[in-house]
Amino acid sequence: MRPFFLACLASVFAILPLTPAFAETIRVAHDQRFPPFAESKDGKSEGLAVDILNAAAQKAGLTIVYVPVPFEQIQRTLDDGRADAAFPLAINPERRQTFDFTAPLVITGGALFVRAPQPSPDGLKALTGKTVVTPKTGPLAGFIQKTAPEVKLVVNADYDQSFAQLLSGEADAAALNFQVGRRLATTLHAGKVTLPEKLFLELPLALAVRKGEKSDLIARLDKGIAAIRADGTWQAIDNRWAGR
């Protein structure tokens, strides 16, 4: 009787979906202020990338505990074990040397912000000889240094300083993440900044782990990401955030 009972119990668990009660928990660090992708509000992580990652994790049988920190501390959270992974990080050749990435969660990129009512520059070449500011924490500084050496690049601390230097006239333009820059310009500097409509650099954002570690986690999340793209969940999330 006992073997029969155990066999039945095993078969029940085999057909049960991986709900949060049975799911493996992973800790994911993110920039505490990176709207609309990820930010910490009232002790809760939210954003477009957060919703997408949560949906993919559910498909993969994973539960995520978020660890919001200042961007400059993200690498440290992986090194000291506070987090298993970090997101949303832009995939570029430099980061591929130290991180392994999932499939992209969302596509973003760099854009140029100028003082209103000036029109948006038509790319970096239009800013030859002019001062462009960008935060040190992102991938845009390296790209500008390599591809537009004729630009007077000033690397600063963060988005707040970038906007301050732009609006004070210290800089002619600010090179910022397209969505993040637009969100902050709209909420903090309404009417003072021309909102760009195009990217000068396209970048995919993904979840990252330290190189050579947690390949199983990457594989599981890749399957989850593929699943939510196939069943329309990804598009529904993107549409919801686009309407905000």
Name each model-derived stretch.
Residues A7-P20:
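Bacterial N-terminal signal peptides
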Residues T63, P139-N156, K192-L195, I225-R244:
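Ligand-binding clefts/hinges and TM-proximal coupling segments of bilobed small-molecule sensing domains
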Residues V114-V132:
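Flexible hinge/capping segments at coil-to-helix
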Residues V67, E72-D84, D100, K125-A126, ...:
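Short helices/loops that flank or line small-molecule/ion binding pockets
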Residues L89-T98, F143-K146, D172-L201:
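A ligand-binding cleft/hinge motif common to bilobed small-molecule-binding domains
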Residues A23-P93, Q97, V155, R220, ...:
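Extracytoplasmic small-molecule ligand-binding "clamshell" domains
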Residues D31-Q32, V106-V114, A185-A226, G243-R244:
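Periplasmic-binding protein-like
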